[in-house]
Regions:
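Interfacial loop-to-transmembrane junctions
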Residues: 242-264
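Juxtamembrane boundary at the C-terminal end of a transmembrane helix
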Residues: 274-282
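Alpha-helical transmembrane segments that form the membrane-embedded catalytic/substrate-binding core
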Residues: 10, 165-166, 185-197, 229-232, ...
């Protein structure tokens, strides 16, 4: 009972913080830069527990956070001046340093160090940074505006999917979705979660009156988030099983670590960006 209360309180605070951050662009940038840093720090700490793996946690974390801020600057004009691609040069220099440094560190398995270093950037820093692509959109006259709904909807769809899948799976779940990796997930739960997300997408389109996306486009976005969010969850489960850990961390009481809370979004965010970009081509 105590664990349930702790888990509930943590969950409420977590959701409230995410939702509130999208009220102001500065709050969104601050919160998700912190989330990016904490998640990379957690990830690199986990992989460093493996034999012959020594990833530079500090520089990898700083690089990921810098990349998030660079994407913010590139996608917006909130901090003065036009977006300049030169902002990415320090990030590229840092990545080159992390690669070249292995020549002189004489580690037992530098290939693993390189692989995990780059994975931290591609798997964590890049997806979180792509939130800026969703949050900052240009109008027809070239003015950049802060879009609250698009990035927030990704998380709403993920939360609805998790809740719907849990409820339906608990009641009707009989056929395992991926027993080798996540025995608790069922096909019935996954389909049920998807149905709940479609209902949420329909509700958003109803109240938005096609001002941003049409009803079919909202529902398409919901399906993309469900499918890739589920894969993201399974990928993190495989990662933990490979490392032999139950939770990625304990920073969130009752919920585990940062990767445990954001695993679905790490695949859903890039997939949503690709989906919306594809819509813009037609």
């Amino acid at each position: 009972m105590k664990n349930f209360i702790v888990r509930t309180i943590t969950g409420v605070i977590f959701v409230a913080a995410i939702v509130a951050s999208f009220i102001r662009p500065e709050a969104m940038v601050l919160l998700f830069s912190i989330i990016t840093g904490l998640t990379i720090w957690e990830f690199t700490g986990l992989v460093n527990e493996r034999e012959n793996v020594t990833v530079n946690r500090f520089i990898s974390t700083v690089a990921g956070v810098y990349f998030f801020f660079a994407m913010t600057y590139f996608c917006s004009d909130l901090y003065g001046g036009s977006a300049k691609s030169v902002v990415f040069i320090p990030y590229l220099v840092t990545i080159i340093y992390l690669l070249v440094a292995e020549l002189y560190l004489k580690q037992a398995d530098p290939i693993q160090d390189w692989a995990y270093t780059m994975l931290a950037q591609m798997y964590i820093a890049l997806p979180f940074s792509l939130l800026n692509v969703l949050a900052f959109t240009a109008t027809n006259n070239g003015v950049v505006t802060f879009n609250t709904l698009l990035p927030l909807s990704i998380f709403v769809f993920l939360w609805v999917n998790d809740s719907g899948a849990y409820c339906v799976g608990s009641l009707l779940g009989k056929h395992k979705l991926f027993p080798r990796i996540s025995p608790g997930k069922s096909w019935e739960g996954s389909v049920g979660g998807g149905v709940f997300v479609l209902a949420a997408a329909y509700a958003i389109s109803y109240f938005m009156d096609d001002r941003m996306l049409t009803m079919p486009q909202w529902m398409g976005l919901g399906l993309v988030v469900v499918i890739f969010g589920t894969w993201g969850d399974l990928i993190e489960s495989l990662f933990k099983r490979t490392l032999g850990v139950k939770d990625s961390g304990n920073i969130l009481p009752g919920h585990g670590g940062m990767l445990d809370r954001f695993d679905s979004s790490l695949l859903a965010i890039p997939a949503a960006v690709i989906y919306l970009y594809t819509l813009s081509l037609f």
